[in-house]
């Protein structure tokens, strides 16, 4: 029956079954009672059966395939919530989508889980730190050597040292569940200029049994690329809001003011800014944003930052404060929503006004911020202050007189209470309330002698219940009443306090309603403590005894990095030694004996990378570069199966063979749960997988090393290859026996679901019972455990045994690596000293075989290889130019950044100079003001003297002097009168007498004296008057000079004020320039084309450049090999090994190779002379003679025959020729071939040789078949085992068209005519009865020797013929 008819019948049967199912089964079957309304057509049937009932017969399927597709469809529908009543959680849906809903993905994922060691690749590790990426970049920038590796490791250690001993300044716990929350830390370097970093701790990533944190619980330290030079007190606070990390800080700058005289004075006020920055999802920090800026009277000293989630919309509260006393503080805050918009509808807070609130004028914003959260400072044992913060309920105190309203029918009944206080305190999960009064109760009741006062709680429906109450009588004095409210969650609590009559129920008559805003207090708090030089994280003493973190301490810093740097500068062996890894140099947290470095602690990720991932990656790189000896040497830092029994490290407790602590320390089982499909995570969880990976790598590397030696086709190299394979076989041991008999019994899924794993059950019976935990989805665990499914064979490991066995088999049967037969010398050919020198400097493997007698012949001739090499060299030169431009650009950016940094330093220096200039000017101004005051005092003094002129005392003295002069003149006048009277006789008697004759003269003298006295008095008066006048003139001069001096000093003061203003302006200018320079530096640092980008580009291009150099060098060496092969130039070398210089990033390597190509081209043009072109036809029947019938019989039986084309048959034709090399070989088969019938035969050249010089000794050895040990000018078997397939049997060269201008070498081209061959017919059914001969058409070239050489060859032939 044809396929089309059968397909039509199958489709008709399908349609009939569908119609029957819809028409009979669905309407009549009890199983479809509830489904009849939903299954109406084939589409409904598809939704029910999850099978396409309209599929055509062209679709190839099976029952099992259909069932699998149906189940897959079913689970997909559950994941999409299309199956009523069935659903899976988000994690299960994600796992199903990523790993399980496609068989290919599921199978690959299972392979990753079962055999992670196979897929461990150090270059593809997902959890590399930024420092490790930089180490990789350094290793990729040039030829990988020990010096390069040491430099890269030193760079890694320098980076690690910077973050190993950071000062942690803040932390933020994102939530209130200390067991599972993420905590973010901010730290800074201990030396200026400060650099800030952040990291996180995920407390949920811990071992289920030991409760120890996994190393991956800690993220790496990452730099905060935000300008933080002006951070006040070094305080930076992290916050997590809306799944985004923020940092907040505040900046304080003292305000400067100018007085009325233009002087710059300190105002005592502080410009304060609250700033915020966030980490973008691309890992780039935003520039800082100023949220609030004001000038405050107080200098803020501390800051806290929290997210308040008590409302529907979370609020970010940033509170800067200054502690004024033990009971109150000054705050400066910013409260905003998740969009950073300042909140205006803040919740009402009720608390007492703090001292000074009215004076300070705190806003509602500050009022909310002051009471939302608060902090405590506690004195530590060593005198330091350790701060920790908690959300608390601020104490609420209300003082009020409350009227008592009784039932309205009781008119006139009332009372008052004075000085009533409601206090609250939040402790643990309890809200304690108490009513208190400091005065007596006053009430006047006419009808009721008792009254109830108490505390009620009101729910959302205004229903009230008693918390506590007291029954009072007029005689009672009840100072207080207490009540406790157990809190279940944060939120608002309505409390009602008041009075009621005894029969008034729970309704408070006189009442006041208070809404208390309650926040959950964080009872369990992290604390960052320091003991000596050790900084550690102190977990709290939990209230519950079964909490894992009770009193736990985790070291945060390490001082081990400096020790590592010191060792790395001397030798990498010291860094990676077992002694270093087990050094007890870590100071104990609370004193005591020193501790080992913690591989699983806060710095464990760095120690893992240093002691394991780094040497593994370097050895991996060496293997990729085919430098297997270096790879073996580096992998010994991890695993050395060849170590001596007296190894000193064994005495230190090192386990045999293993040299890396991360591979032998007891791991935290279950770490793989965090990344169940990551082979590195699985291996880190159980390092036996890492040990297997290292073991497999070492074994493969040894095999690869053996393969490299095997390809050299030298006897000694084969010996080394055999040793490598034996070593790898010894490491693997015997191949495990596998039982091929299968006892599998088919099972249904239902039966399989009831099978259990007996071994797991036995382990469970032996284990201690675990604490019951709620069942959650775990993608690492199977839904059903049973023992009917087993792990498959590790084909990768089994392949190593197969590979070794294949290599050993080929060695034992004289085959090449790919299984072809070869003929080899008994001993190696000698290597020239030049070749040995070249071997030391060549980079690629193809250039390491210094002897050009054993190089691999390229596929292409010299001219096409030259063109390809030129193209590759031009590309390499372009790569080098691009690399140089990138290096120049990076250096330019580095120089610009350096200039900017230096400019910043110079600006700071200029600012200091300007400030000193201002201080000098201010001092000069003060001196001028003193001088002005002195001049003003002199002016005032002399002006006062001038205005006063003669004092009253001096005037009185003048008057007295005038009176004295007048008195003296009167006395003199009286004396003159007396003298005149003396002339008159005063005796009257007998004689007249008694007169004095001299009296007139005396009188005259007295008159003269009177005149003298008068003149003298006048002159004295005039003298005094004139002296006073002169004195006044002097005073006038003095006060005028003082006035001029005051004016002059005033001008100088004005000039000095102008200079101070100018200096302040210059200072502002320099500060603005500094800010602009810093902003420009920040722009240069943060822009995309920054220095780090060029560093990355240089790293990537350096790696590409090195690989391009390897590729182009291989092309050039192939071109060189083609040239040497074509022109038979022997051991000449054109491509040197010094083209690449690691010191200069390999620049000019392309130009060096270009010069080598030009030299090769010149040699090719000069020496590519035309050779003799000869064709020789050879009959195997004639060549083999008597043995031909037997050989012909072998051919007819499809058995291969071997024959030789000896040098002698060619020498007999032309004695003056040498260097006979085959150009092409074609075969003619004289036989009858039917129409459309082909010949199927293979011709293989097993060996060949030719002489390179016209040397008679070489010719004699070739003709006499003597040993070739003393024949230096003989080339043997350059490219053995070349083969052609014959199809026509008529001058058949094995090619569709024989083209002597082909870019590729022709089969057998360049080999010697002195050769060995193997011929075989391969078609077992072909009739060869008509075959009677095999004709070879050999076309070869040869060089012409001298006549002397020709005569010598003839003599050798004559001697051979005579001997025969």
Curated annotation (Swiss-Prot):
GO terms for cellular component: extracellular region. InterPro entries: ABC_toxin_N, Neuraminidase-like, TcA_TcB_BD. Disruption phenotype: Cells with a disrupted yenA1-yenA2-chi2-yenB-yenC1-yenC2 locus are no longer pathogenic in C.zealandica larvae. Keywords: Coiled coil, Secreted, Virulence. Transmembrane segments: none annotated. The isolated toxin complex includes 3 peptides starting between residues 768 and 778 of this protein, which might be physiologically relevant. Residues 1025-1080 form a coiled coil. It is found in: Secreted. Part of an orally active toxin complex (TC) with strong insecticidal effects on larvae of the Coleoptera Costelytra zealandica, Acrossidius tasmania and Adoryphorus couloni and some Lepidoptera larvae. The TC has an endochitinase activity. Semipurified toxin complex consists of at least YenA1-YenA2-YenB-YenC1-YenC2-Chi1-Chi2. The Yen-TC:K9 subcomplex is about 26 nm tall and 22 nm in diameter with 5-fold symmetry and 5 copies of YenA1, YenA2, Chi1 and Chi2; the chitinase subunits may be solvent accessible on the exterior the complex. The Yen-TC:K9 subcomplex has no insecticidal activity. The native complex with additional YenB, YenC1 and YenC2 subunits is 16 nm taller and is insecticidal; the toxicity-conferring subunits are present at about 1 copy each. This is Toxin subunit YenA2. The lineage of its organism: Bacteria, Pseudomonadati, Pseudomonadota, Gammaproteobacteria, Enterobacterales. The gene is yenA2.
């Amino acid at each position: 029956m044809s396929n089309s008819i059968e397909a039509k019948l199958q489709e008709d049967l399908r349609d009939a079954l569908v119609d029957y199912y819809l028409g009979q089964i669905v309407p009549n079957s009890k199983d479809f009672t509830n489904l009849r309304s939903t299954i109406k057509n084939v589409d409904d049937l598809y939704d029910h059966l999850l099978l396409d009932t309209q599929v055509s017969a062209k679709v190839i399927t099976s029952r099992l395939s259909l069932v699998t597709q149906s189940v897959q469809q079913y689970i997909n529908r559950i994941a999409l919530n299309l199956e009523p009543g069935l659903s899976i959680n988000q994690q299960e849906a994600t796992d199903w989508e990523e790993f399980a809903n496609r068989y290919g993905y599921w199978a690959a994922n299972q392979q990753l889980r079962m055999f992670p060691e196979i897929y461990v690749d150090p270059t593809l590790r997902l959890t590399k730190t930024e420092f490790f990426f930089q180490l990789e970049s350094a290793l990729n920038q040039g030829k990988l050597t020990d010096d390069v590796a040491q430099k890269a490791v030193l760079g890694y250690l320098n980076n690690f040292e910077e973050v190993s001993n950071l000062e942690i300044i803040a932390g933020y716990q994102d939530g209130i569940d200390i067991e599972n929350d993420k905590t973010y830390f901010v730290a800074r370097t201990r030396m200026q200029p400060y650099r800030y970093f952040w990291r996180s701790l995920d407390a949920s990533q811990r071992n289920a049994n030991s409760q120890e944190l996994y190393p991956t619980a800690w993220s790496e330290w990452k730099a905060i690329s935000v300008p933080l030079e002006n951070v006040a007190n070094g305080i930076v606070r992290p916050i997590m809001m809306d799944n985004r990390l923020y940092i907040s800080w505040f900046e304080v700058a003292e305000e400067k003011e100018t007085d009325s005289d233009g002087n710059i004075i300190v105002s005592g006020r502080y410009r304060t800014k609250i700033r915020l920055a966030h980490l973008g999802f691309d890992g780039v920090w935003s520039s800082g944003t100023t949220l609030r800026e004001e000038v405050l009277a107080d200098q803020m000293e501390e800051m806290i930052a929290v997210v308040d989630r008590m409302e529907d919309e979370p609020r970010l509260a940033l509170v800067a404060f200054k502690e004024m006393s033990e009971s109150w503080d000054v705050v400066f805050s910013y409260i905003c929503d998740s969009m950073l918009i300042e909140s205006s509808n803040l919740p009402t807070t009720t608390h007492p006004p703090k001292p000074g609130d009215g004076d300070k004028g705190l806003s509602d914003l500050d009022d909310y911020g002051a009471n939302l959260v608060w902090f405590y400072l506690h004195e530590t044992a060593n005198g330091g202050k350790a701060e920790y913060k908690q959300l608390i309920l601020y104490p609420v105190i209300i003082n009020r007189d409350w009227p008592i309203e009784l039932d309205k029918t009781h008119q006139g009944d009332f009372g008052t209470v004075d000085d009533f206080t409601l206090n609250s305190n939040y402790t643990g999960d309890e809200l304690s309330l108490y009513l208190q009064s400091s005065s007596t109760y006053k009430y006047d009741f006419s009808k009721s002698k008792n009254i109830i006062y108490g505390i009620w709680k009101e729910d959302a429906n205004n229903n009230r219940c008693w918390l506590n109450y007291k029954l009072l009588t007029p005689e009672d004095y009840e100072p207080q009443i207490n009540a406790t409210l157990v809190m279940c969650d944060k939120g608002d609590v309505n409390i009602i306090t008041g009075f009621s009559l005894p029969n008034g129920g729970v309704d408070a008559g006189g009442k006041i309603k208070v809404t208390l805003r309650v926040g959950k207090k964080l009872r369990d708090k992290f604390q960052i403590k320091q003991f000596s030089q050790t900084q550690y994280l102190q977990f709290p003493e939990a209230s519950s005894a079964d909490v894992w973190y009770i009193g736990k301490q985790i070291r945060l810093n390490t001082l081990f990095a400096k020790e590592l740097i010191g060792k790395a500068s001397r030798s990498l062996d010291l860094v990676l030694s077992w002694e270093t890894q087990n050094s007890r140099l870590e100071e104990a947290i609370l004193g005591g004996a020193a501790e080992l470095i913690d591989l699983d602690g806060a710095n464990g990720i760095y120690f893992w990378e240093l002691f394991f991932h780094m040497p593994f990656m370097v050895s991996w790189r060496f293997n990729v570069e085919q430098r297997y000896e270096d790879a073996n040497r580096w992998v010994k830092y991890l695993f050395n199966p060849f170590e001596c029994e007296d190894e000193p490290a064994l005495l230190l407790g090192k386990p045999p063979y293993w040299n890396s602590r991360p591979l032998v320390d007891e791991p935290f089982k279950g770490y793989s749960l965090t990344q169940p499909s990551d082979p590195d995570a699985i291996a880190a969880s159980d390092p036996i997988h890492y040990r297997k990976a290292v073991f497999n790598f070492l074994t493969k590397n040894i095999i690869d090393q053996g393969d490299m030696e095997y390809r050299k086709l030298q006897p000694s190299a084969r010996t080394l290859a055999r040793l490598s394979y034996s070593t790898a076989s010894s490491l693997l041991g015997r191949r495990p026996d596998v039982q091929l008999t299968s006892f599998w019994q088919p099972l249904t899924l239902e039966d399989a679901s009831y099978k259990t794993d007996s071994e797991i059950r036995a382990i469970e019976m032996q284990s201690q019972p675990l604490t019951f935990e709620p069942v959650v989805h775990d993608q690492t665990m199977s839904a059903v455990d049973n023992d009917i499914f087993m792990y498959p064979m590790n084909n990768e490991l089994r392949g190593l045994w197969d590979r070794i066995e294949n290599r050993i088999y080929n060695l034992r049967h004289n085959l090449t690596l790919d299984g072809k037969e070869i003929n080899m010398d008994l001993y190696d050919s000698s290597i020239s000293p030049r070749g040995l020198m070249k071997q030391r400097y060549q980079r690629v493997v193809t250039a390491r075989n210094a002897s050009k007698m054993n190089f691999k012949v390229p596929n292409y001739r010299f001219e096409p290889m030259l063109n390809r090499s030129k193209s590759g060299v031009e590309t390499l030169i372009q790569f080098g130019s691009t690399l140089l431009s990138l290096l120049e650009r990076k250096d330019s950016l580095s120089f610009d950044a350096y200039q900017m940094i230096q400019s910043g330093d110079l600006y700071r220096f200029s600012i200091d100079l300007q400030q000193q200039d201002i201080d000098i000017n201010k001092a000069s101004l003060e001196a001028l003001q003193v001088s002005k005051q002195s001049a003003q005092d002199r002016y005032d003094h002399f002006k006062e003297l001038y205005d006063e002129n003669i004092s009253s005392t001096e005037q009185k003295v003048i008057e007295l002097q005038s009176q004295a002069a007048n008195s003296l003149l009167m006395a003199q006048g009286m004396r003159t009168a007396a003298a005149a009277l003396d002339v008159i006789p005063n005796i009257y008697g007998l004689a007249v007498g008694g007169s004095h004759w001299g009296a007139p003269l005396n009188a005259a003298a007295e008159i003269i004296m009177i005149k003298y006295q008068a003149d003298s008095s006048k002159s004295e008066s005039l003298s005094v008057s004139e002296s006073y006048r002169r004195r006044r003139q002097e005073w006038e001069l003095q006060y005028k000079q003082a006035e001029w001096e005051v004016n002059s000093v005033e001008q100088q003061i004005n000039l000095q004020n102008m200079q101070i203003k100018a200096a302040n302006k210059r200072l502002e200018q320099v500060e603005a320039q500094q800010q602009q320079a810093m902003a420009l530096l920040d722009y240069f640092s943060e822009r995309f084309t920054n220095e780090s980008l060029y560093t990355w580009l240089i790293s990537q291009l350096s790696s590409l450049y090195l690989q391009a150099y390897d590729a182009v060098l291989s092309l050039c060496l192939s071109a060189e090999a083609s040239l040497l092969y074509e022109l038979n130039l022997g051991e000449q070398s054109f491509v040197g090994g010094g083209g690449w210089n690691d010191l200069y990033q390999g620049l000019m390597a392309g130009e060096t190779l270009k010069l080598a190509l030009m030299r090769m081209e010149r040699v090719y043009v000069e020496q590519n002379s035309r050779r003799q072109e000869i064709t020789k036809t050879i009959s195997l029947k004639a060549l083999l003679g008597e043995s031909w019938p037997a050989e012909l019989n072998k051919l007819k039986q499809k058995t291969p025959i071997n024959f030789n084309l000896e040098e002698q048959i060619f020498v007999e034709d032309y004695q003056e020729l040498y260097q006979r090399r085959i150009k092409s070989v074609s075969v003619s088969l004289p036989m009858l071939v039917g129409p459309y019938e082909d010949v199927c035969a293979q011709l293989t050249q097993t060996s060949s040789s030719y002489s390179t010089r016209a040397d008679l000794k070489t010719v004699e050895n070739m003709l006499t078949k003597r040993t070739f040990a003393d024949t230096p000018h003989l080339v043997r078997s350059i490219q053995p085992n070349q083969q052609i397939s014959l199809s026509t049997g008529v001058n058949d060269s094995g090619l569709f068209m024989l083209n002597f201008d082909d870019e590729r070498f022709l089969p057998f081209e360049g080999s010697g005519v002195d050769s060995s061959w193997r011929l075989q017919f391969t078609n077992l059914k072909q009739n060869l009865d008509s075959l009677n001969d095999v004709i070879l058409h050999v076309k070869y070239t040869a060089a012409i020797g001298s006549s002397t050489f020709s005569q010598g060859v003839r003599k050798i032939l004559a001697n051979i013929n005579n001997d025969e």
